[in-house]
Amino acid sequence: MRCLGGSSLSRLLRMLSQSQGRALSSTGPAVYDVVISGGGMVGTAMACALGSDPHLQHKKVLLLEAGNRKPFDHLPENFSNRVSSITPGSATLLASFGAWDHILAMRLKPYKRMQVWDACSDALITFDKDALEDMGYIVENDIIIEALTKQLELMSDHVEVMYRSRALSYSWPPPYNNGKATPWVEIELADGQRLHTKLLIGADGHNSMVRSAAGMQSVQWNYNHAAVVATLHLSEATDNNVAWQRFLPTGPIALLPLSDTCSSLVWSTSPEHASELVSMDEESFVDTVNSAFWSNENHSEFITSAGSLLHSALSFFMPTGSSPRQLPPSVSRVEQNSRASFPLGLKHATEYIRHRVALIGDAAHRVHPLAGQGVNMGFGDVACLAHHLSQAAFNGSDLGSTKHLLEYETERQRHNLPLMAAVDLLKRLYNTKQPPIVLLRTLGLQATNALTPVKEQIMAFASK
């Protein structure tokens, strides 16, 4: 008898799995190995990661998305107002299953430098990469979704996608099979269809129904802040390869490069001020944005003098430790109908996994956008969970077992919790004009900017 090759064996296993699923579906609910609830950026990336893994080729994977497949016939002329800062680590994940090539074929803007500075003093910190390296990439969320969807459609033999499929309820199996109840998670859809899955992955956002239905608790608070987003046109064309962020007393404002002539605005402020910014006329809005980046009205003479003394001392002892200050570009106009706002908050699930369920992305953690880490944390979850599921499949283990799911939870919480705590601390530290705190953060920021090894560690952690 002729031996089966690896690809032939994989096809045979997949056919057996699919025929088993059809047989079960003829007498009861279809059974899947993995069901992903939520087809956003993180959920679709999870589907792509599983669909491309050689150890999972014979597994039945389903992606449930409540909305329609978004039409994307051609690249829009205007930029979307919702963008993400993609780290090199996230780009590596997207490249590993082919989605990054689709993004490169559409559009993205690399940046090589980041400058962060205080509106209440001259303190700043800069992050630079080597001349040939990109520090990160600004990509429109719609383009990321389209790239992932295109790649997923190439994996239709391995991953099934159900659009317009909203889950109504979930039924959980007992921790130990008693032989009476189904050993799988049961999903009831709005159209009356029922599905069974050995592992349910919740990628359904910060108001996750999966998390709530599983009884998984979360810690949360509202910042009483809103993010205002808009697409801005610059006064003149530049290389525009710097990401700018200034900490105002009312909240951080960021200018992220989209092209040589356009940038994306993300301004965190009070809900009342956000409403004003969204509704004011274009000329007033542009003047307000330029003033937010250029005005020194919040400067304190005492704080500025103290900061200058420290800067001089640091420059004397470490003359090559800090990069020169650059001036941000001037804004000439705002793209019509690009202004919008959304509320901000922090949320963290106390547990990412339970028997036959795992949370990823915003379903597990929601963070302030000031560090640009939200979707990157989600992509980190995808890479980690896909790795552990691949190992489980290779070892012949049950994908829904808590054994390897706990390894995922431990690894991701060790990364996510310190990052979320640091972002929350920064938000609170810069949300005041109290002189002692302003002086403390001014001295701390300048000292950090002078210590290249410390900055390299920060960049390495944030780039994962």
UniProtKB/Swiss-Prot annotation:
<protein>
    <recommendedName>
        <fullName>Ubiquinone biosynthesis monooxygenase COQ6, mitochondrial</fullName>
        <ecNumber>1.14.15.45</ecNumber>
        <ecNumber>1.14.15.46</ecNumber>
    </recommendedName>
</protein>
<dbReference type="GO" id="GO:0016712">
    <property type="term" value="F:oxidoreductase activity, acting on paired donors, with incorporation or reduction of molecular oxygen, reduced flavin or flavoprotein as one donor, and incorporation of one atom of oxygen"/>
</dbReference>
<dbReference type="InterPro" id="IPR010971">
    <property type="entry name" value="UbiH/COQ6"/>
</dbReference>
<comment type="function">
    <text>FAD-dependent monooxygenase required for two non-consecutive steps during ubiquinone biosynthesis. Required for the C5-ring hydroxylation during ubiquinone biosynthesis by catalyzing the hydroxylation of 4-hydroxy-3-(all-trans-polyprenyl)benzoic acid to 3,4-dihydroxy-5-(all-trans-polyprenyl)benzoic acid. Also acts downstream of coq4, for the C1-hydroxylation during ubiquinone biosynthesis by catalyzing the hydroxylation of 2-methoxy-6-(all-trans-polyprenyl)phenol to 2-methoxy-6-(all-trans-polyprenyl)benzene-1,4-diol.</text>
</comment>
<keyword id="KW-0274">FAD</keyword>
<dbReference type="InterPro" id="IPR036188">
    <property type="entry name" value="FAD/NAD-bd_sf"/>
</dbReference>
<keyword id="KW-0333">Golgi apparatus</keyword>
<keyword id="KW-0503">Monooxygenase</keyword>
<feature type="transit peptide" description="Mitochondrion">
    <location>
        <begin position="1"/>
        <end position="24"/>
    </location>
</feature>
<keyword id="KW-0809">Transit peptide</keyword>
<comment type="subunit">
    <text>Component of a multi-subunit COQ enzyme complex, composed of at least coq3, coq4, coq5, coq6, coq7 and coq9. Interacts with coq8b and coq7.</text>
</comment>
<keyword id="KW-0560">Oxidoreductase</keyword>
<dbReference type="InterPro" id="IPR002938">
    <property type="entry name" value="FAD-bd"/>
</dbReference>
<comment type="similarity">
    <text>Belongs to the UbiH/COQ6 family.</text>
</comment>
<keyword id="KW-0966">Cell projection</keyword>
<dbReference type="GO" id="GO:0042995">
    <property type="term" value="C:cell projection"/>
</dbReference>
<keyword id="KW-0999">Mitochondrion inner membrane</keyword>
<dbReference type="InterPro" id="IPR051205">
    <property type="entry name" value="UbiH/COQ6_monooxygenase"/>
</dbReference>
<dbReference type="InterPro" id="IPR000689">
    <property type="entry name" value="UbQ_mOase_COQ6"/>
</dbReference>
<dbReference type="GO" id="GO:0071949">
    <property type="term" value="F:FAD binding"/>
</dbReference>
<dbReference type="Pfam" id="PF01494">
    <property type="entry name" value="FAD_binding_3"/>
</dbReference>
<keyword id="KW-0472">Membrane</keyword>
<dbReference type="GO" id="GO:0006744">
    <property type="term" value="P:ubiquinone biosynthetic process"/>
</dbReference>
<dbReference type="GO" id="GO:0120538">
    <property type="term" value="F:2-methoxy-6-polyprenolphenol 4-hydroxylase activity"/>
</dbReference>
<dbReference type="InterPro" id="IPR018168">
    <property type="entry name" value="Ubi_Hdrlase_CS"/>
</dbReference>
<keyword id="KW-0285">Flavoprotein</keyword>
<dbReference type="GO" id="GO:0031314">
    <property type="term" value="C:extrinsic component of mitochondrial inner membrane"/>
</dbReference>
<keyword id="KW-0496">Mitochondrion</keyword>
<dbReference type="GO" id="GO:0106364">
    <property type="term" value="F:4-hydroxy-3-all-trans-polyprenylbenzoate oxygenase activity"/>
</dbReference>
<comment type="pathway">
    <text>Cofactor biosynthesis; ubiquinone biosynthesis.</text>
</comment>
<dbReference type="GO" id="GO:0005794">
    <property type="term" value="C:Golgi apparatus"/>
</dbReference>
<keyword id="KW-0831">Ubiquinone biosynthesis</keyword>
